[in-house]
């Protein structure tokens, strides 16, 4: 994570005081309350799906900066605690705000993608991430395009890593996805297309073949 990337974080949607807090956390983590920083990032991620897509990169940079400066992991601990709280209340979150739920799944997958221990994804996040994806593959979620879209995007992003960590759960997830694809009603044509694409993407070793890319992406753009 090079220094210039610090200015690339999309933090313009925060108020000036919070922007300053985040900038300080990236440069001088010991000077701020890192638990507060973790809460600010999670709160904003649940409201802003654009930010939740790249919050993992910022969290990774703060964790690196804190470790380098003080050899501590206050921020990481605060972040994981808050992720766990939201995870435990995920059904309530989904019932309250579908957008908040989709943002949460995007965020936890983003964190899983970026956070590493000895260059391996964090084991503590594997089952929570799987549980979120399993929820997205339930029939009532598959009838909502934003949830199907989230499921497919996250599998594109972290599916291969997740399968390496627990292949059996990925097999079970794809049984649900295939069953969902065959649902007699309730699935839009776009949702069917997205599910078929992710089934073929995994079957091809988590790669899109040129022919599939041309077919699916011309269909989606139409």
Curated annotation (Swiss-Prot):
* Keywords, alphabetical: Cytoplasm, Nucleus, Translation regulation
Source domain of life is Eukaryota
A Pfam family reported for this protein in Swiss-Prot or TrEMBL:
MIF4G
Q: A GO molecular function for this record? A: translation activator activity
Provide the MIF4G domain boundaries. 3-205
* Miscellaneous section: Depletion of MIF4GD results in cell death and reduced histone mRNA translation.
Record-given protein name: MIF4G domain-containing protein
* Annotated source species: Homo sapiens (Human)
């Amino acid at each position: 994570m090079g220094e210039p990337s610090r200015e690339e974080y999309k933090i313009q949607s925060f108020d000036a005081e919070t922007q300053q807090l985040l900038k300080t956390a990236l440069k001088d983590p010991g000077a701020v309350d890192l638990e507060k920083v973790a809460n600010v990032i999670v709160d904003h991620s649940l409201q802003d799906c654009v930010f939740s897509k790249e919050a993992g990169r910022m969290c990774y940079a703060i964790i690196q900066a804190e470790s380098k400066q003080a050899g501590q992991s206050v921020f990481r601990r605060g972040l994981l605690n808050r992720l766990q709280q939201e995870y435990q209340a995920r059904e309530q979150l989904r019932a309250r705000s579908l957008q908040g739920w989709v943002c949460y799944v995007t965020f936890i997958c983003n964190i899983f993608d970026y956070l590493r221990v000895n260059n391996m994804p964090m084991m503590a996040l594997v089952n929570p991430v799987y549980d979120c994806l399993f929820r997205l593959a339930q029939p009532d979620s598959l009838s909502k395009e934003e949830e199907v879209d989230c499921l497919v995007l996250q599998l594109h992003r972290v599916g291969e890593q997740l399968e390496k960590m627990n292949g059996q759960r990925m097999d079970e997830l794809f049984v649900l996805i295939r069953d969902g694809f065959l649902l007699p009603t309730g699935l839009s044509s776009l949702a069917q297309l997205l599910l078929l694409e992710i089934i073929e993407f995994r079957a091809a070793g988590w790669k899109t073949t040129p022919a599939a890319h041309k077919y699916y992406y011309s269909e989606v753009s139409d």
